[in-house]
């Protein structure tokens, strides 16, 4: 071990069954690096310490080799087999210290730098909010000054109050204009045949979005082979040749100029995207069946500008492009909108950003072999047409309804068919009546020896209920629209509202702290739990302190607050038991 790093000879395994790739492991405080002995091997690994979620290791003395299994935050495992246990323990201890340091440094920076980097304007805004809102000031004093919450935690949930200007600012992205790229008109000087195109960043973005081949050509040619001005000159020369519909001239110039041919030939990148989309279409949708509905082949129908009726030599067919293709592509790009949010005057940056976005979307859209198979199976199931299937005769249970009223009124028509001793039922009714009559006569003669409730207690309860009901009717009759909260004394009402606001604040921070992944969150949840317990006790004391005729209604007001706190307490206890049991099952840290 030298300075702030450690190096050991290990074997790297991507899975447990992997035989392993020999090499050396170098660990620093911020990074873990594995370099294989074979330079041609692709098992080189680089992991940031802050991305390591957990580490597991084999217990010394077991029959297993010394393995150290590191799991990152993406749930991917990296297994290292060491030559001996001391080397493994040395690396494990080094990683543990590095993880602890990575965990403490962000927390320290949040506490120290956030207050230092606060501008005077932000501090003035906070003080202004506290002065204008007495309830906010009371919450701040209750939780921040008592150190239940830090200053940053308290204001983190009130970003809307601190950033009203950002709220007023529209977050909607600007779309693309509906004007087509082919509609860009040049300006002329009136004396020569020279034309000038005025290219804005928006026009360039639209060209790159509609024509991937032009975007890729810009990345390949500018500035290595030509300047940006020469590039756009060739592009608009190609557009001019398209507009003349003279495919012979276009083919001749493309044969002489290799760079110009890129703009004149069909867009292969766009063609690949189209083929990929077609493969994902349900094969039961037969587009050829709709060709009979096409009227463009009839006289006086169709788009004459489309060029579909022009006679073109077969060898020049690749230099032909229809208006319909341009319209469809332009419509697709306009509907897609701006896929990137880059505001730069550098055309190359825009082109590269668009290319990266397309590559990411392509990677996301690629389906695996299993997913492809599932899609084909789903299509085969959908392809089955109901009118061509054999009739499905499901087994039916015949209904036996003697009287329709038995079915519609009691739905017990079949029950009547089962003999269940109707005569015995009638005889039992007479016996039960006789027994009840004898019991009543006996009670009249001797009385109840052991009453269920003492008469004094029952009289007191009924009297109290009578007074409460009479009072409630009297109060409710005065102002039906008035709520019970308005009838409470002002001090009690303010206390109830403050408790409700405090509980909302505590629960907001409590639930946002889960899952507990750091010591900082564990400490924060403990403070919040103690504060909620204190609030719970205050609620109980408040219920006992109110007048007896208001106690029931106050209990109804307080009950939702206590239920919310009980749910938080239950979650805290369950999570604590789970973490305690989990740590108890792994005394050596190995799962």
Curated annotation (Swiss-Prot):
Pfam families: BSD, PH_TFIIH. One of its GO terms (biological process) is DNA-templated transcription. It comes from the Eukaryota. Its main location: nucleus. Residues 112-166, 191-243 form the BSD domain. It is found in: Nucleus. GO terms for cellular component: transcription factor TFIIH core complex. Keywords: DNA damage, DNA repair, Nucleus, Repeat, Transcription, Transcription regulation. Component of the general transcription and DNA repair factor IIH (TFIIH) core complex, which is involved in general and transcription-coupled nucleotide excision repair (NER) of damaged DNA and, when complexed to CAK, in RNA transcription by RNA polymerase II. In NER, TFIIH acts by opening DNA around the lesion to allow the excision of the damaged oligonucleotide and its replacement by a new DNA fragment. In transcription, TFIIH has an essential role in transcription initiation. Belongs to the TFB1 family. Component of the 7-subunit TFIIH core complex composed of XPB, XPD, TFB1/GTF2H1, GTF2H2/P44, TFB4/GTF2H3, TFB2/GTF2H4 and TFB5/GTF2H5, which is active in NER. The core complex associates with the 3-subunit CDK-activating kinase (CAK) module composed of CYCH1/cyclin H1, CDKD and MAT1/At4g30820 to form the 10-subunit holoenzyme (holo-TFIIH) active in transcription. This is General transcription and DNA repair factor IIH subunit TFB1-1. It comes from Arabidopsis thaliana.
């Amino acid at each position: 071990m030298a300075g702030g790093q450690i190096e050991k000879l290990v074997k790297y395994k991507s899975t447990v069954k992997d035989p392993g790739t020999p090499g050396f492991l170098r660990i620093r405080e911020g990074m873990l690096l594995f370099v294989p002995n074979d330079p041609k091997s692709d098992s080189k690994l680089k992991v940031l310490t802050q991305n390591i979620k957990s580490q597991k290791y084999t217990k010394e003395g077991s029959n297993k080799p010394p393995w150290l299994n590191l799991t990152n935050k993406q749930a991917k495992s990296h297994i290292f087999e060491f030559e001996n246990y001391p080397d493994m323990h040395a690396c494990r201890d080094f990683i543990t210290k590095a993880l602890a340091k990575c965990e403490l440094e962000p927390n320290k920076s949040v506490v120290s730098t956030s207050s230092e980097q606060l501008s005077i304007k932000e501090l003035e805004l906070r003080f202004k909010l506290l002065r204008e809102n007495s309830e906010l000031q009371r919450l701040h004093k209750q939780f921040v000054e008592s150190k239940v919450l830090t200053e940053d935690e308290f204001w983190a949930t009130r970003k809307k109050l601190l950033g009203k200007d950002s709220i007023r600012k529209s977050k909607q992205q600007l779309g693309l204009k509906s004007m087509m790229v082919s509609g860009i008109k040049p300006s002329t000087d009136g004396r020569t045949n020279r034309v000038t195109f005025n290219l804005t960043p928006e026009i360039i973005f639209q060209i790159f979005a509609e024509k991937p081949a032009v975007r890729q050509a810009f990345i390949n040619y500018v500035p290595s082979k030509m300047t940006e001005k020469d590039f756009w000159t060739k592009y608009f020369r190609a557009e001019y040749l398209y507009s003349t519909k003279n495919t012979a001239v276009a083919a001749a110039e493309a044969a002489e100029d290799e760079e110009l041919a890129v703009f004149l030939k069909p867009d292969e990148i766009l063609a690949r995207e189209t083929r990929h989309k077609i493969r994902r279409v349900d094969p039961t949708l037969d587009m050829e069946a709709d060709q009979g509905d096409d009227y463009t082949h009839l006289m006086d129908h169709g788009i004459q500008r489309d060029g579909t009726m022009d006679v073109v030599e077969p060898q020049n067919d690749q230099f032909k492009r229809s208006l319909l293709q341009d319209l469809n592509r332009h419509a697709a790009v306009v509907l897609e909108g701006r896929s990137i949010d880059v505001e730069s005057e550098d055309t190359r940056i825009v082109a590269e950003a668009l290319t990266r976005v397309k590559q990411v979307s392509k990677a996301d859209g690629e389906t695996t072999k299993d997913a492809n198979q599932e899609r084909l199976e789903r299509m085969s199931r959908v392809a089955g047409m109901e009118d061509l299937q054999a009739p499905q005769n499901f087994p039916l249970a015949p209904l036996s309804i003697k009287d329709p009223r038995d079915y519609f009124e009691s739905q017990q028509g079949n029950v009547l068919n089962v003999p269940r001793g109707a005569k015995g039922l009638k005889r039992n009714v007479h016996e039960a009546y006789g027994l009840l009559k004898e019991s009543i006569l006996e009670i009249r003669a001797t009385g109840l020896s052991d009453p269920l409730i003492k008469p004094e207690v029952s009289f007191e309860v009924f009297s109290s209920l009578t007074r409460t009901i009479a009072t409630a009717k009297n109060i409710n009759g005065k102002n039906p629209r008035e709520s019970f909260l308005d009838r409470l004394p002002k001090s009690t009402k303010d206390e109830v509202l403050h408790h409700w606001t405090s509980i909302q604040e505590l629960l907001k921070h409590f639930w946002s702290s889960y899952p507990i992944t750091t010591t900082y969150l564990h400490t924060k949840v403990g403070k919040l739990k103690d504060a909620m317990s204190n609030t719970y006790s205050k609620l109980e004391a408040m219920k006992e302190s109110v007048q007896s005729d208001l106690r029931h209604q106050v209990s109804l007001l307080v009950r939702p607050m206590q239920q919310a706190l009980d749910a938080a307490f239950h979650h805290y206890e369950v999570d604590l038991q789970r973490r305690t049991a989990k740590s108890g099952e792994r005394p050596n840290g190995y799962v």
